């Protein structure tokens, strides 16, 4: 009889525990799936909010060895127009390439340039055996989103991609060609600057010329 009472008590405790589990309130007002979809919608809308596109400052590789590269992107609903300061096999600097993109929720909210295009995928493709090339990404995770700036990191290698909106009167080709003119007009690889009496070394990537001291008052 005593054993029957114990078993009955245990059965009641199990039923009460199960009831509590099913009646537990969600901490959030929305489900995780709803929150993920809301984040996708927010990021998708933000990408399309820049009327003349975004300046994309892209830093490929695992460190500073490649420096940064400038692209411009204008996002539509499912396509993006891209232009780059770089020249590829089929696109001159400043020439526009149109390709597909998508915003999805997987490991966070992601921007994926999954349709092959030279301007993005040139940073991701190896140059040959045991040569990772620029060691870049074509899938990026949103880290912060606003109308003034969007910051993303590469999904595989953690590359940094910073986007800021272009002014309405900016001509894409003139802007990117202007960047290339600055690089062409800088004939030295390393500059020694004196700022407030302190010597600072400024290095320019991919230019192999001797050092020249410059004094800035």
Regions found by a protein language model. Give the residues of each.
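Acidic/polar, low-complexity intrinsically disordered N-terminal segments immediately downstream
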Residues: 21-110, 168-193
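Nucleic-acid-binding small beta-barrel platforms of the OB/S1 family
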Residues: 106, 113-116, 212
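Solenoidal tandem-repeat scaffolds enriched in leucines and small polar residues
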Residues: 197-204
